[in-house]
Design a protein with these regions (language model features):
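Conserved acidic catalytic loop of the alpha/beta-hydrolase fold
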Residues: 86-89, 93-111
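Catalytic active-site module of serine/aspartate enzymes centered on a nucleophile-bearing elbow/loop
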Residues: 262-300
Length: 300
């Protein structure tokens, strides 16, 4: 792994695949590190010849941390409902600027911009605010932020908003595993042991719940992107699971409806996670999409 300054922020990142491969920037979700998804997912894309760049978002993992008081989430939500600008340490727009800045720091003019969950929200903003940097948009179990979309299930919502009883490793891992189960895929077995081991490694690498809280504030403070997404004119792939109870599949469908000519794939029984079995379904969709976009670009 390596570290660069992007948008004035120290960002930890990792590359897989050939340096001369088609660049794909992967943006992680709420509170998650670049190591939070199975390594096999990024490796599968790299094995297809892509230059895969993943990074720790600001305030998480080994990237630069923020300090200071945690935002009052109730006040942030009330400000948004009242049409006022909420007070938050940073916004999703700032995080999109980090992603664009990382490409600049690596000397990459443009890349396929992929993001999952909150990372999908950030990827949408990269495509909107830095269009020359986005060869395509790949939005994975994410949303437009439209307030009329169905909410998370009570169990999934609780998984995000409740805290473990203590911050020791065993308690944090058990709490996270229980939460992930609430929005896991129904199509494949829930591998508690493997997930617990992954969460434990991430705890050892960089446990920083304060950053997760600030990420949540940034999500709450983000205005809907519905109308802005209608202006996009780039290739877009939207992937969602029918069993996602955290960000409902209606959100994925709505994202695809807002982007002209977007491709939408709703995967039966897939939740808000990436079990090993899902990689064999999701990765080929991404590889095929990127190859078609690149072929069309060369033919133009």
């Amino acid at each position: 792994m390596s570290r660069v300054k992007a948008n004035g922020v120290e960002i930890e990142y990792e590359e897989l695949g050939p340096r001369d491969g088609v660049p794909l920037l992967f943006i992680n979700g709420f509170g998650s590190q670049l190591t939070s998804w199975p390594a096999e997912f990024r490796q599968s894309l790299a094995d297809a010849g892509m230059r895969v760049i993943a990074f720790d978002n600001r305030d998480t993992g080994l990237s630069q941390k923020w300090t200071g008081q945690i935002p009052d989430m109730k006040a942030v939500s009330e400000a948004m409902r009242a049409g006022r600008k909420p007070e938050v340490p940073y916004t999703l727009d700032d995080m999109a600027a980090d992603a664009a800045g990382l490409l600049d720091a690596l000397g990459i003019d443009s890349a396929h911009i992929a993001g999952a969950s909150m990372g999908g929200m950030i990827a949408q903003l990269v495509a909107l605010d830095y269009p020359k940097k986005a060869r395509s948009l790949i939005s994975i179990f994410s949303t437009t932020g439209d307030r009329s979309l169905p909410p998370s299930s009570p169990e999934a919502q609780a998984a995000l908003t409740t805290r473990p009883l203590s911050q020791d490793r065993a308690t944090v891992v058990a709490h996270a595993v229980k939460g992930r189960r609430s929005y896991a895929s129904t199509r494949w077995p829930f591998d508690e042991a493997r997930l617990g081991a992954l969460i434990g490694r991430n705890y050892d690498r960089a446990f920083y719940p304060e950053g997760t809280s600030r990420h949540w504030a940034a999500i709450l403070a983000a205005p809907p992107r519905t109308e802005r997404l209608k202006s996009l004119r780039l290739p877009a792939l939207v992937l969602h699971g029918s069993a996602d109870t955290l960000i409902r599949p209606e959100a994925g469908r709505h994202t695809a409806q807002c982007i002209a000519h977007a491709e939408y794939h709703e995967i039966d029984g897939w939740g808000h996670d990436m079990p090993l079995e899902a990689i064999a379904v999701v990765s080929p969709l991404i590889v095929d999409f990127v190859r078609r976009v690149e072929a069309k670009k060369k033919a133009a």
